[in-house]
């Protein structure tokens, strides 16, 4: 029986799902906002909230626990430095999900997952667009 199982499988194997969510959380903590589908955003939010809470607690053991999810050392330093100070007085609820409507290709519901109290200049990263960035030619 599947009583009280509170996790979405997202139509992926366990290793694929965990790797995808870890990468999404790392991108969220690095760029402070990501654009993705609503179910993925809801799952990534759970992990991101836990990582920020570990950052607020500090300590070597919590750094090692967070490093299991966030592999980027610069992002870890940001969590245990900048975010620790930013969210010191907030008892939880560090992220916000804003619904963006439906994607044109497959009608999947899109959402913006962002950190609250973030600077307005930070633009969201589109996790769905795999198109290469256009480079300007130096003339």
Swiss-Prot record:
Keywords: Ribonucleoprotein, Ribosomal protein. The keyword Ubl conjugation does not apply. GO terms for molecular function: structural constituent of ribosome. GO terms for biological process: translation. GO terms for cellular component: cytosolic large ribosomal subunit. It comes from the Bacteria. The keyword Ribonucleoprotein applies. Belongs to the bacterial ribosomal protein bL17 family. PANTHER family: LARGE RIBOSOMAL SUBUNIT PROTEIN BL17M, RIBOSOMAL PROTEIN L17. HAMAP family: Ribosomal_bL17. Part of the 50S ribosomal subunit. Contacts protein L32. This is Large ribosomal subunit protein bL17. It comes from Myxococcus xanthus (strain DK1622). The gene is rplQ.
């Amino acid at each position: 029986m599947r009583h009280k199982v509170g996790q979405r499988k997202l139509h992926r194997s366990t290793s694929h799902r965990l790797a995808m969510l870890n990468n999404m959380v790392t991108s969220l903590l690095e760029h402070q906002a990501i654009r993705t589908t609503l179910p993925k955003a809801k799952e990534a939010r759970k992990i991101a909230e836990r990582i920020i809470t570990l950052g607020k607690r500090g300590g070597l053991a919590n750094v090692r626990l967070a490093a299991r999810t966030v592999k980027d050392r610069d992002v870890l330093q940001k969590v245990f430095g900048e975010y620790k100070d930013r969210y010191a007085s907030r008892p939880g609820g560090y992220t916000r999900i804003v619904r963006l409507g439906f994607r044109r290709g497959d009608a999947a519901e899109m959402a913006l997952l962002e950190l609250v109290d973030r600077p307005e200049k930070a633009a969201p990263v589109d996790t769905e667009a795999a198109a290469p960035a256009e480079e300007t030619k130096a003339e």
